[in-house]
Amino acid sequence: MKKLMLLGLAVSLFSTAGLEAKTVQKAKKQSPSTSFELNVAHINDHHSHLEEEKMPLKLNGKTVTVHIGGLPRVAQAIKNFRQGNKNTLVLHAGDALTGTLYYTLFEGKADAELMNAINFDVFTLGNHEFDDGNKLLKSFLDVLKIPVVSANVVPDKGSILEGKWKPYMIKNVGGQNIGIIGLDVVKKTKESSSPGDDIKFLDEVETARKYVNELQGKGINKIIIVSHSGYEKNVEIGEKVDGVDLIISGDTHYLLGKEFEQFGLVPEKEDYPKKVNSPNGNPVYIAEAWNYSYLLGQMKAKFDKNGVITELIPTPKVLIGDDFFEVKNAEGKAVQLDAKEKNAILNSIKNNKNIAAIKNDPALAKLLE
């Protein structure tokens, strides 16, 4: 473990980060309905894995151990994404908490500070947010300054969690109003975590349908669900609920897309994203971004004037470092690649849309020294 003065430093450095991100319930006046392009980036299930980790990948014909993930690297990747695209949304599909010593020591506050610095547009609750009860979740949310949505998790009046999240938000992006609904997995949260008795959990499919209808009643025709309900349940929602365009999934930790086999990984036998049809025949896309901040999901969605996605261009990327490439020599000893081999790998990465060699964001990396 590196310096554990993280929180004090983070609070002073990022106390105002994310304050401009507000949960909007009243739709702003939007531009006349025309074709529209939206760029979405997302992660899920980072589980307090704040630092980069080591992992062997197959790169340029070699098995090479690299640094992968870490929120400082995610921060830099998201910064690049926002700078390189217009009309962006950056989403977190839940389970920020539990999994490393950072959670044990800081009880979610370290996660919240780094998430604030990244300035996600939306976060939805996952089952592990409830692992240590309402009080700890409240302390996490007290520090978190980004909008939180969860439509099927309803605190009773008087609960310490009352008012800590909304069922959805409406965000104006590039002159168009986007409805973003949050969902959590019901059965697993109730049976395996520790929510208080003053928290009600509602059916995922019926809740999605209710709030899609409410958003459509407000004139919203572009609707995203950020859902920690698990991949299979999210596919079910896509197939049963009209009006949904995109579901950003969490909980199941799925790496989607056979393209990742080239790196020696074993993805699920599903596309990134999976396309299904809603009851009215319109396309719905379901995407999940593996876990532990190893991968940044990315896609460009093109909507027609009726809010239907006519084209979706996916570019999910495994996030690795650019300065650590370790192999075993003839004696079985771990050594760094020489400069020529390293440059060959970096050049191969530049030409591959599904992996990125990215430096850590300096400010966030400094917090973890």
Which residues does each predicted region cover?
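Positively charged n-region of N-terminal signal peptides that target proteins for export
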Residues: M1-L4
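Low-complexity, intrinsically disordered regions enriched in charged/polar residues
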Residues: L7, V40, N44, I68, ...
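Bacterial N-terminal signal peptides
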Residues: G8-S15
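Preference for short coil/turn "hinge" residues that link or interrupt alpha-helices
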Residues: S12, D111-E113, N351, A357
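Acidic, metal/ion-coordinating pockets
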Residues: A21-D323, A330
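A short C-terminal boundary segment appended to hydrolase-like catalytic domains
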Residues: Y294-E369
